[in-house]
């Protein structure tokens, strides 16, 4: 008789990317980013990105931590729209005055120093996070406004007018900024806008993406697509590039977040090879280092600690940001603040060298995601053809120098506006989604990726991976599983996210039960589990019993995927640090499962027709060996890999000769092939 073996993992069925779901892009847009002209006369639509279904113009919005930007594809080109102050980027700030007026943008930021407790910024650093997240707790100590806990999530408490205290979610604050961008576009286009493409950092998790979409709804916008910021910037760089394939690294360092994406651009196909980043690193952190430095200087020179003085800190923050910007073009500046506190004027020089010293570790930290993305993409430094700088913080000379040194002196490409490139790409995406086509466009394809591995738990707590990190999305993958026990009528599908081999070390996203499975021996039912990630990075899971047709489906919502950037980094870091431990544990589980499967299959044989062909002594011998093995398994749940393998060999030494002899006596009928192989279609992991 053949040796029964543990059911192997079923072949993953890659159903492929549906071309209809892929994003078609223009290959040549006339001109570069155009300055917004004065609003056209009422009723002049201007050939904007119209929906084929009559849904109106679709705009592209870069919702940034510190600044936001809006664009539209119109008259065969992308136009970045200036706000009512004539500026093409708008501060992502919201404030409330004594008279109850709400200010958004420049007006809010300009009065922040005089009204710190009622001026809100950095909502993007709170959105989609948990109140208990380390980043939130750290930021709370630095923000002048009150951040409070509401159902485990951070909210902002602010007095909107005298005596009227309100609590806003980060989604609501972001919605206020989105509303301003929407109104800016409406004033320019002369029509109502209800649809948008909104960008997010590539390393935003599902909860943060869902929360961003919710902010759009609050702002009266249908967010047709969430697009990753570095991918949008790559469109701005490569939309008019033709010729041989190029590997492009997008280095996106903004006010509050940092992303690195590596893309292969080949005649209109934009394929993301890998992405990495830090959703809590950017210009705001560089400003904070300067503030900490000057607080110490003030304490030393004036004997005054302004750390608790929100107004003084507001003035200092404003001047530190100005100094940081100036040092990108000058080697020394002077930070001067009139009447910083108690009528005391402050004046202190700041050199570029000192600025670089204060932020040296943060600048070096940006190289870590670069190295990880390069490794994930499987590329060497010489394989990168272009380095594209995006985000205002990439203007810092030291950041540029570190990147240049890493790539052996290669100069970054400065052909795109770092402040506007993301909104440009979003506007192109909006145009394509709206169905806009003209004589200047050709079909182009964008292939983005999922940032983390997605899978489910199988027998022994093993993380069975269905969608590995950096898999192109949208994607759908199906794998067939089976039951772990006899007459099992319900299976629990537990969905996880992470890089470790055991589910206990990964993040549980959600779980559900598939019931009504027809009672059958262990291993007989076939349950097809399908993971589907849409173009926004949102996951849905379907489980179906092939025999009965019963199915259950869930969409993993933001509530289910409450995962902070710190946890993402921990998952990847621990996966790298404990890879050997993961491998050993997986091998231990595999060895135990192999022994259990062999015991089960021999017991099944003893209960079948082959048992009738056994002689009494043979049957007793096999039954005794199986009983001893079963008892040993029950008494040794934590045995090592070698112990399980040795026990399996001992059992095989007893059972295989008997089964082989019976098989030969029966003329080869009623048994399994001697090599023990079974059809792969019936071989499935157990749930």
UniProtKB/Swiss-Prot annotation:
Its keywords, alphabetically, are: ATP-binding, Chaperone, Endoplasmic reticulum, Nucleotide-binding, Signal, Stress response
| GO molecular function terms noted in the UniProt entry | ATP binding; ATP hydrolysis activity; ATP-dependent protein folding chaperone; heat shock protein binding; protein folding chaperone
Q: What does this protein do?
A: Functions as a chaperone during endoplasmic reticulum (ER) stress response.
Q: What PROSITE patterns does the annotation carry?
A: ER_TARGET (PS00014), HSP70_1 (PS00297), HSP70_2 (PS00329), HSP70_3 (PS01036)
Gene designation per UniProt: BIP4
Species of origin reads Oryza sativa subsp. japonica (Rice)
What Pfam families would the database entry show?
A: HSP70 (PF00012)
> Which protein is depicted?
Heat shock 70 kDa protein BIP4
**The organism's place on the tree of life at top rank:** Eukaryota
The record's CDD domains line, in alphabetical order, gives: ASKHA_NBD_HSP70_BiP (cd10241)
Q: Where is the composition biased (Acidic residues)?
A: 676-687
Please tell me whether the keyword Hydrolase is annotated for this protein: no
* Lineage, highest ranks first: Eukaryota, Viridiplantae, Streptophyta, Embryophyta, Tracheophyta
Q: Subcellular localization, per the record?
A: Endoplasmic reticulum
């Amino acid at each position: 008789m053949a040796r029964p073996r543990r059911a192997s993992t079923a072949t993953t069925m890659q159903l492929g990317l549906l071309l209809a779901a892929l994003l078609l892009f223009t290959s040549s847009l006339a001109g570069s980013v155009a300055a917004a002209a004065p609003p056209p006369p009422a009723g002049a639509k201007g050939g904007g990105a119209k929906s084929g279904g009559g849904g109106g113009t679709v705009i592209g919005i870069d919702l940034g931590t510190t600044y936001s930007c809006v664009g539209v594809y119109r008259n065969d080109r992308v136009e970045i729209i200036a706000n009512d102050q004539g500026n093409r980027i708008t501060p992502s700030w919201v404030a409330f005055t004594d008279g109850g007026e709400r200010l958004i943008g420049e007006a809010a930021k300009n009065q922040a120093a005089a009204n710190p407790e009622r001026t809100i910024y950095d909502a993007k650093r709170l959105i989609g996070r948990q109140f208990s997240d380390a980043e939130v707790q750290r930021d709370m100590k630095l923000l002048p406004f009150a951040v409070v806990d509401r159902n485990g999530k951070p909210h902002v408490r602010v007095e909107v007018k005298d005596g009227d205290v309100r609590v806003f979610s980060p989604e609501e604050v972001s919605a206020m900024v989105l509303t301003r961008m929407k109104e800016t576009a409406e004033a320019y286009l002369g029509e109502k806008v209800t649809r948008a493409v909104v960008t997010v950092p590539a390393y935003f998790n599902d909860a943060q993406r869902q929360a961003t979409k919710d902010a759009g709804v609050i702002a009266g916008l249908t967010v047709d697509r969430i697009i990753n910021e570095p991918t949008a910037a790559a469109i701005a760089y490569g939309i008019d590039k033709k010729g041989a394939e190029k590997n492009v690294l997008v280095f996106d360092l903004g006010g509050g977040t940092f992303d690195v994406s590596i893309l292969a651009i080949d005649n209109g196909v934009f394929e993301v090879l890998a992405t990495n980043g830090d959703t809590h690193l950017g210009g705001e952190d560089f400003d904070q280092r300067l503030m900490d430095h000057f607080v110490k200087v003030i304490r030393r020179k004036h004997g005054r600690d302004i750390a608790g003085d929100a107004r003084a800190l507001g003035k200092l923050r404003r001047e530190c940001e100005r100094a940081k910007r100036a040092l990108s073009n000058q080697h020394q500046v002077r930070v001067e603040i009139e009447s910083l506190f108690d009528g005391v004027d402050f004046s202190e020089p700041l050199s570029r060298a000192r600025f670089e010293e204060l932020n040296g570790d943060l600048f070096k930290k940006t190289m870590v995601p670069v190295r990880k993305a390069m490794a994930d993409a499987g590329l060497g430094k010489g394989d990168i053809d272009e380095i594209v700088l995006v985000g205002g913080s990439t203007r810092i000379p030291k950041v540029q120098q570190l990147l240049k040194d890493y790539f052996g002196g290669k100069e970054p490409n400065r052909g795109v506006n770092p402040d506007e490139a993301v909104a440009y790409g979003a506007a192109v995406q909006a145009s394509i989604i709206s169905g806009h086509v003209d004589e200047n466009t050709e079909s182009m394809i964008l292939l983005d990726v999922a940032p983390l591995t997605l899978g489910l738990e199988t027998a022994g707590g093993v993380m069975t991976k269905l969608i590995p990190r950096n898999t192109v999305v949208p994607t759908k993958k199906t794998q067939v599983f089976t039951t772990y026990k006899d007459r099992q009528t319900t299976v629990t599908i537990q969905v996880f996210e992470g890089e470790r081999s055991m589910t206990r070390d990964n993040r549980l996203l959600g779980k559900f039960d598939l019931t009504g499975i027809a009672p059958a021996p262990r291993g007989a039912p076939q349950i097809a589990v399908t993971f589907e990630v849409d173009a926004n990075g949102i996951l849905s899971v379907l489980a179906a019993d092939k025999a009965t047709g019963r199915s259950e489906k869930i969409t993993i919502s933001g509530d289910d995927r409450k995962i902070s950037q710190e946890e993402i980094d921990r998952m990847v870091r621990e996966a790298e640090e404990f890879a050997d431990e993961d491998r050993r544990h997986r091998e231990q589980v595999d060895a135990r499962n192999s022994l259990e499967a062999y015991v089960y299959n021999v017991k099944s044989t003893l209960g079948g027709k082959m048992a009738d062909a056994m002689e009494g002594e043979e049957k007793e011998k096999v039954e005794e060996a199986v009983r001893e093995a079963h008892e040993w398994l029950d008494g040794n749940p934590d045995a090592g890999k070698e112990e399980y393998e040795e026990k399996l060999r001992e059992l095989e030494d007893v059972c295989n000769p008997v089964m082989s002899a019976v098989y030969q006596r029966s003329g080869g009928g009623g048994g399994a092939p001697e090599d023990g192989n079974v059809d792969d279609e019936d071989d499935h992991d157990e749930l």
